[in-house]
Amino acid sequence: KQFTKCELSQNLYDIDGYGRIALPELICTMFHTSGYDTQAIVENNESTEYGLFQISNALWCKSSQSPQSRNICDITCDKFLDDDITDDIMCAKKILDIKGIDYWIAHKALCTEKLEQWLCEKE
């Protein structure tokens, strides 16, 4: 599913303030991480990242390429590619608990200031 900024804002509403992260920071980070696309897959040197939050099979989820993953979120990685982002959000909260928002490289580089543009402006 390809989300819009406003759709994603509604879906991520319960993360607003979680781990002291403001919603616009998260929306910005997800834009630069996956382009709001639940089917985004990025191959890295030693791991693959899945879905909206680009969750890695090295630590967080299990895939056929990563049977030795610690699988902290106790889930198969392909679950992060469907339209239901409930499980993605649960895993993202674990990542926020353990690693913080800077787990997503885009955050520090692109999403720490001028965040007004990431707010959903309701007509």
UniProtKB/Swiss-Prot annotation:
Pfam families the record matches: Lys (PF00062)
Compartments reported by the entry: Secreted
Sites carrying sugar chains: N45
One GO cellular component term: extracellular region
Leader sequence residues: none
Cysteine-cysteine disulfides: C6-C120, C28-C111, C61-C77, C73-C91
GO terms classed as biological process: defense response to Gram-negative bacterium; defense response to Gram-positive bacterium; lactose biosynthetic process
Membership in a protein family: Belongs to the glycosyl hydrolase 22 family.
Subunit structure: Lactose synthase (LS) is a heterodimer of a catalytic component, beta1,4-galactosyltransferase (beta4Gal-T1) and a regulatory component, alpha-lactalbumin (LA).
Name of the protein this chain belongs to: Alpha-lactalbumin
Species name: Papio cynocephalus (Yellow baboon)
Top-level taxonomy: Eukaryota, Metazoa, Chordata, Craniata, Vertebrata
